[in-house]
Amino acid sequence: MPREGLTLRCETCKMENYITKKNKKLHPDKMEVTKYCPKCNQHTNHKEKK
């Protein structure tokens, strides 16, 4: 199955907050979304963990 799990990490504090899935065949680039970080107590950019 092409859909694989990945972890999203906060760019500010480097805390791993979210686990999600994506289809790596259709979207080979790293995912970047704005999500809430409980440690920073604000919305920050979260990038796909390496």
Swiss-Prot record:
Biological process per Gene Ontology, one example term: translation
Keyword terms: Ribonucleoprotein, Ribosomal protein
InterPro entries: Ribosomal_bL33, Ribosomal_bL33_CS, Ribosomal_bL33_sf, Ribosomal_zn-bd
UniProt family annotation: Belongs to the bacterial ribosomal protein bL33 family.
Stated name of the protein: Large ribosomal subunit protein bL33B
Domain of life: Bacteria
Signal peptide annotation: none
UniProt keyword Ribosomal protein present: yes
